[in-house]
C-alpha cells in the first residue's frame, strides 16, 4: 500500500510537525508507566485483549482527543521482552472522540488527520527499540518524535518532510514517487 494522508481541509496549510505538536499538547501524557497503569490509561485492541488489527486510546487529560493505530499489533505484557508492542503498523488516525473497539473496529468520531501506508514493522525481539513500540508508546506519552522520524523517512522519497504542509504532502503523494529515470520525468 502506498503512503497516503487524509485530513480535514482546515489543516491543509499546517505542517505535519505543527499539527502533531498541537495534537500532542492537547492529548498530553496518559502516564502509562510502572505503578501508574489503569484501564483508563491502557487503551485497547480491536480483535483481542493483547493483540489485534487496531490499538486505540483516548487522552486521560480531556477524555476526547484520541488516536487509532492500525495494522497487525501485539502487546507482550509480561512475556519477554515485557511491555512491548510489536508487529506491523500500517495506519494512524488522530482526532476527537473514540468509538468502537469491543464488537466493531475503532473509529475517530471527529477525524483530523490519518496516515496510511506507513509500512512500519518491529519484531518482538527488538523490544522497546522497535519502531512500532517507539511510535505508539511515544504517542501515548504525548511525544511525536518517533513518528516524525518515521514520517521523515517516508516523505524523503517525495522530497518532503514533516515541515511540509498537508496540502503539499497530498499533492506529492497523488503523483507518487518520481525517480530521475521515470518515463514521466524523461518526457518532460
Curated annotation (Swiss-Prot):
Entries under Gene3D superfamilies matching the protein: Haem-binding HasA
Subunit structure, briefly? Monomer.
Describe how expression is induced or repressed.
Answer: By iron depletion.
Q: Which GO terms describe its molecular function?
A: metal ion binding
What is the scientific name of the source organism? Answer: Serratia marcescens
Q: Name one Pfam family in it.
A: HasA
Q: What does this protein do?
A: Can bind free heme and also acquire it from hemoglobin. Conveys heme from hemoglobin to the HasR receptor which releases it into the bacterium. HasR alone can take up heme but the synergy between HasA and HasR increases heme uptake 100-fold.
Q: Which UniProt keywords apply?
A: Heme, Iron, Metal-binding, Secreted
Put simply, this protein is called Hemophore HasA
Does the entry feature the keyword Secreted, yes or no? yes
Q: Where in the cell is the protein located?
A: Secreted
Metal-binding listed as a keyword? yes
Q: Quick one: which residues bind heme? A: 32, 75
GO cellular component terms?
extracellular region
